[in-house]
């Protein structure tokens, strides 16, 4: 493999050197291709290289922003480094913006005595309620992963059994809608969806299938293949959680992992640390799952509080598939659209 890589590097170096492209960028691009097994057609090769070079500049800029904000956030070359910003949004984010409408059910605020008694750190992964990180692929189905993650947690807490549930069941079969300002926001597979709609589908459908019986394909199927004999979990209702991060922590401890929506545009090159740079809390374009919270010391701050957020971009992204979001500042709108199913 090393011999092949060296040969490709030599050929590529001769090709791009005539165009005045720095050798360092050439080397980085070839290392990127090797690490992430990227294959391009002849026509696509230079286009991807140009995007990669542009993204190197963006990564440098993001790291400077993090330093200026005394943030622990780290950005770097990852598997998305050959995608333009528009491609990243189209492939991996949700084109159904999450909006908290007045007709959605909302849970009560928790008792102050209970809130004051919750632990300083809590993680449902260590308690067995969280399945391994999944990968939505180039399909805007994040909403389905956020939903299944929540229901998986609720089912575990209720039945003491962790069952991986089928996102594809939702992608193919869920066409529920909610209304906002006279317009319909419907679940449309890879074209986006919302967790409240998905909960309603599961309730009306009498359950959701297991992952093993209805595996994920990263594309919207031409038909629904639901089989009631393979139901993995059922729910009876759902509720939104008040827009309050202290209350959110209480509900995580008392009820389980929470489905949320957030602004993830700046997550493209995230590789680690606590995300704490400016983003848009009013543009909720990605569905994810909060599984716990904690705090850490950084070079800038002691006891930095953060949320532990499970993503659906594979375990080779971020912190082994997770992102840590600064807690207490409504980072990226983390508290604006929070929900949980009810068994």
From Swiss-Prot:
UniProt-recorded name of the protein: Cysteine proteinase 1
Upper lineage: Eukaryota, Amoebozoa, Evosea, Eumycetozoa, Dictyostelia
Class of this enzyme: hydrolase
Family named by the database record: Belongs to the peptidase C1 family.
Span of the signal peptide: 1-18
Organism annotation: Dictyostelium discoideum
Biological process (GO), any one: proteolysis involved in protein catabolic process
Subcellular location as annotated: Lysosome
This protein's record includes keyword Repeat: no
The protein's Enzyme Commission number: 3.4.22.-
Cysteines joined through disulfide linkages: 139-190, 173-224, 279-332
Catalytic residues in the record: 142, 286, 311
PTMs per UniProt: Phosphoglycosylated, contains GlcNAc-alpha-1-P-Ser residues.
């Amino acid at each position: 493999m090393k011999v092949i890589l060296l040969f490709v590097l030599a050929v590529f170096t001769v090709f791009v050197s005539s165009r005045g492209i720095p050798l360092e960028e050439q080397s980085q691009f070839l290392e990127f291709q090797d690490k992430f097994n990227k294959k391009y057609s002849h026509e696509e090769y230079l286009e991807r290289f140009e995007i990669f070079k542009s993204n190197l500049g963006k990564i440098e800029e993001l790291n400077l922003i993090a330093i200026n904000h005394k943030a622990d956030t780290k950005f770097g070359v990852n598997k998305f480094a050959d995608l333009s910003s528009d491609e990243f949004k189209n492939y991996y984010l949700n084109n159904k913006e999450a909006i908290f409408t007045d007709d959605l059910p909302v849970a009560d605020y928790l008792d102050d005595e209970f809130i004051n008694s919750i632990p300083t750190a809590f993680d449902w992964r260590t308690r067995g309620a969280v399945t391994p990180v999944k990968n939505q692929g180039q399909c805007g189905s994040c909403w389905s992963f956020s939903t299944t993650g929540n229901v998986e947690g609720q089912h575990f807490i209720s039945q003491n059994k962790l069952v991986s549930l089928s996102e594809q069941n939702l992608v193919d079969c869920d066409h529920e809608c909610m209304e906002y300002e006279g317009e319909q926001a419907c679940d449309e597979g890879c074209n986006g969806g919302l967790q409240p709609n998905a909960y309603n589908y599961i309730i009306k459908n009498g359950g959701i299938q297991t992952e093993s019986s209805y595996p994920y394909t990263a594309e919207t199927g031409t038909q629904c293949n639901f089989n009631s004999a393979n139901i993995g979990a059922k729910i009876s209702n759902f509720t939104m959680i008040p827009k309050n991060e202290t209350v959110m922590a209480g509900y995580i401890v008392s009820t389980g992992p929470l489905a949320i929506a957030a602004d993830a545009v700046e997550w493209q090159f995230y590789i680690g640390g606590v995300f704490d740079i400016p983003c848009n809390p009013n543009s909720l374009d990605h569905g994810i799952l909060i599984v716990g919270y904690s705090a850490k010391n950084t070079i800038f701050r002691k006891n930095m509080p953060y949320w532990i957020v499970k993503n659906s971009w594979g375990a080779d992204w971020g912190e082994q598939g997770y992102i840590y979001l600064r807690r207490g500042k409504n980072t990226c709108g983390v508290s604006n659209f929070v929900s949980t199913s009810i068994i």
